[in-house]
C-alpha cells in the first residue's frame, strides 16, 4: 500500500500535551489561590486589623500596592527564566527545578501569616519561582508541534488557557471558604500541596516531551546585532546631519557582518515588540480585577439567587466566563466572522480586546460612583464587567501567547514569551506606584474612589487609539517549523 503523503495525514495531538496541561492547572490553582485572598488578608491581618474606618482607604491602597508588586516580580522573572532556558539549560530543566523552589516558597508563606516581613519573603520566593517558569511553560507547548500538526497549536493554546482558568476557578471558590472557616495557615498551605502535585505531574511526562536543546549564547544574538545596528544608526545620523551623506541603509551595513537569518530574527523581534508595547496598560487594568475589584466587592450587595457570596469569590466569574468563552470564540465567533469575508488576524483580536477592557472598566467606574454616594449596589453589575473583561482576555492574552511563539525565530521563543509577560510586570508596577502615591498622600492621592478607575480608563483609551494607527502598518510572518 503506498504511503500517504504527510500533508494528507490527519494531524495528531502530541502525547505530552496532557502532562503540560495538567501541570499548568495545578500550578495555576496554587498561584491564584494566593491571589484570591491576598488583598483582603493583607488589610485585615496587617494594614487595618482594628477595622478603623478612618484608615481603611489607606490600608486598601497599601494592600493593592503589595498585591501589584507581587505580580510585578512574578512577571518580571520570566525574562530571566526565558534567557536561562533558551541559552543555557533548556525549558524542561528550568521548569522542573524552579517548581521545587516554588513549593518551598509556599511553605514559607503558610508558616508566616502573623509576620509581615517573613510573609513578604515567601511572596518574593513564589514570585521568583512562578516567573522563572512562566515563559518556559507556554513556549514548551509550542515546542511539541511541527509542520505536520501546527494547525492544532491554536486549539491547544486554547486548552492550555482553559487549564489555567480551571485551576483559577477551583481556587477562588474553595480557598476563600477555607480562609474564613479555618484561617490563613491552611488557606495558604493548600496551594503548597497543589504546587507539589504540579511538579510531580510535570516530572511524570519527562519521557514524552519534545525537548528543544538550548541554543547557547551565539555571536549572532539579538542584543549584539541590536547594539551594532544602533551604533551604525548613530554614525549614519551624524553623517547625514553634518556631511549630508548616507551611502547605505543601517540594515544593509549590518548585513555585511551578520547573516540574513539572524537579521530577519532581530527584525521579527522588533515587529513583535511594537505590538507588545501596548500590553502593559492592558494588564495595569486587567490585574485590578484580582485586587481593586475584590476590595470593591466588600462594599456591594453580594446576594446572588438568594445566596450570599464572599467578596473574594466574586472574581471566580472571570475564569468561569473565560472557560465558557474560549470555545465560543474559537469554534463559533471566529469562524463565523471569517465566513463574512473579514479575516480574524491576531492584531485585530488584540485591538478588539483593548476596546472591551475599556467598556468593562466604565461599568466599574459607574459602580464605584454609586458606592461613593453611599449606596450598596448589586454585585450583578460587577459580574457584567467580569464577563466583558473575560472576552477581552480571550482576545488579548491567548492571542499574544500564540503570537509570541509563531512570530519569533527559534532561538527567541522563550525570550519573546518572557518579553510579553514583562508587559504584565510593567503594568503592575505602574499600578503599584499609583497606589503607593495614594497611600502616602502623593500626586495620585486625588484619584480615589471612582476617579481612580476613570484615570486608568483615560490612559487605556489613549493607548487604544495609538494602537489602531500602529497595528495596520505591521506585517506578520510565521516561524513555525
Enumerate the language-model features and the residues they cover:
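Hydrophobic core of transmembrane alpha-helices in multi-pass small-molecule transporters
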Residues: 116-133, 373-395
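Intracellular juxtamembrane helix-capping segments at the cytosolic ends
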Residues: 132-147, 393-408
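Central cavity-lining transmembrane alpha-helices of secondary-active solute carriers
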Residues: 65-86, 316-331
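C-terminal ends and interior cores of transmembrane alpha-helices
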Residues: 100-117, 355-374
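A gly/Pro-rich, aromatic-decorated transmembrane alpha-helix motif that marks the paired
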Residues: 36, 79-83, 165-181, 365, ...
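Conserved MFS/SLC helix-loop-helix module at the cytosolic interface between two early adjacent transmembrane helices
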Residues: 78-101, 107
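Short amphipathic helix-loop junctions that connect adjacent transmembrane helices
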Residues: 36-62, 291-311
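Intracellular loop-helix junctions on the cytosolic face of multi-pass helical membrane proteins
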Residues: 1-22, 147-148, 154, 175-316, ...
Amino acid at each position: 500500500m503506498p504511503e500517504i503523503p504527510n500533508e494528507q495525514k490527519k494531524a495528531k495531538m502530541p502525547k505530552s500535551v496532557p502532562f503540560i496541561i495538567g501541570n499548568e492547572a495545578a500550578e495555576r490553582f496554587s498561584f491564584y489561590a494566593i491571589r484570591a485572598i491576598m488583598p483582603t488578608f493583607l488589610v485585615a491581618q496587617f494594614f487595618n486589623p482594628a477595622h478603623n474606618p478612618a484608615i481603611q482607604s489607606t490600608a486598601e491602597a497599601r494592600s493593592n500596592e503589595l498585591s501589584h508588586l507581587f505580580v510585578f516580580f512574578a512577571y518580571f522573572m520570566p525574562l530571566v527564566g526565558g534567557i536561562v532556558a533558551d541559552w543555557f539549560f533548556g525549558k524542561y530543566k528550568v521548569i522542573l527545578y524552579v517548581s521545587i523552589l516554588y513549593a518551598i516558597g509556599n511553605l514559607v508563606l503558610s508558616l508566616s501569616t502573623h509576620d509581615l516581613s517573613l510573609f513578604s519573603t515567601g511572596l518574593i520566593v513564589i514570585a521568583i519561582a512562578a516567573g522563572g517558569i512562566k515563559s518556559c511553560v507556554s513556549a514548551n507547548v509550542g515546542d511539541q508541534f511541527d509542520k505536520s500538526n501546527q494547525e492544532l497549536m491554536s486549539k491547544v493554546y486554547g486548552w492550555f488557557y482553559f487549564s489555567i482558568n480551571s485551576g483559577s476557578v477551583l481556587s477562588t471558590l474553595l480557598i476563600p471558604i477555607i480562609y474564613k472557616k479555618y484561617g490563613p495557615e491552611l488557606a495558604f498551605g493548600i496551594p503548597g500541596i497543589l504546587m507539589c502535585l504540579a511538579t510531580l505531574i510535570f516530572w511524570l511526562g519527562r519521557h514524552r516531551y519534545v525537548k528543544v536543546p538550548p541554543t547557547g549564547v551565539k555571536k549572532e544574538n539579538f542584543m549584539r546585532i541590536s547594539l551594532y545596528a544602533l551604533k551604525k544608526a548613530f554614525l549614519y545620523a551624524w553623517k547625514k546631519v553634518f556631511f549630508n551623506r548616507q551611502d547605505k541603509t543601517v540594515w544593509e551595513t549590518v548585513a555585511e557582518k551578520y547573516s540574513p537569518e539572524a537579521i530577519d530574527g532581530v527584525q521579527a523581534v522588533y515587529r513583535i515588540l511594537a505590538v507588545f508595547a501596548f500590553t502593559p496598560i492592558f494588564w495595569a487594568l486587567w490585574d485590578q480585577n484580582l485586587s481593586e475589584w475584590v476590595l470593591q466587592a466588600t462594599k456591594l450587595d453580594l446576594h446572588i439567587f438568594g445566596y450570599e457570596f464572599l467578596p473574594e469569590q466574586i472574581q471566580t466569574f472571570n475564569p468561569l466566563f473565560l472557560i465558557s468563552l474560549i470555545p465560543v470564540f474559537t469554534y463559533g465567533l471566529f469562524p463565523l466572522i471569517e465566513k463574512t469575508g473579514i479575516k480574524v488576524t491576531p492584531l485585530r483580536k488584540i485591538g478588539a480586546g483593548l476596546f472591551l477592557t475599556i467598556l468593562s472598566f466604565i461599568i466599574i467606574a459607574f459602580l464605584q460612583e454609586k458606592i461613593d454616594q453611599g449606596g450598596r449596589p448589586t454585585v450583578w453589575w460587577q459580574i457584567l464587567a467580569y464577563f466583558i473583561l473575560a472576552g477581552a482576555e480571550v482576545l488579548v492574552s491567548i492571542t499574544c501567547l500564540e503570537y509570541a511563539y509563531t512570530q519569533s525565530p527559534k532561538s527567541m521563543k522563550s525570550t519573546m514569551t518572557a518579553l510579553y509577560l514583562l508587559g504584565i510586570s510593567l503594568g503592575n508596577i505602574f499600578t503599584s506606584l499609583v497606589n503607593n502615591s495614594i497611600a502616602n498622600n502623593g500626586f495620585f492621592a486625588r484619584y480615589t474612589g471612582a476617579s481612580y478607575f476613570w484615570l486608568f480608563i483615560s490612559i487605556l483609551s489613549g493607548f487604544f487609539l495609538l494602537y489602531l494607527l500602529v497595528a495596520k502598518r505591521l506585517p506578520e510572518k510565521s516561524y513555525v517549523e
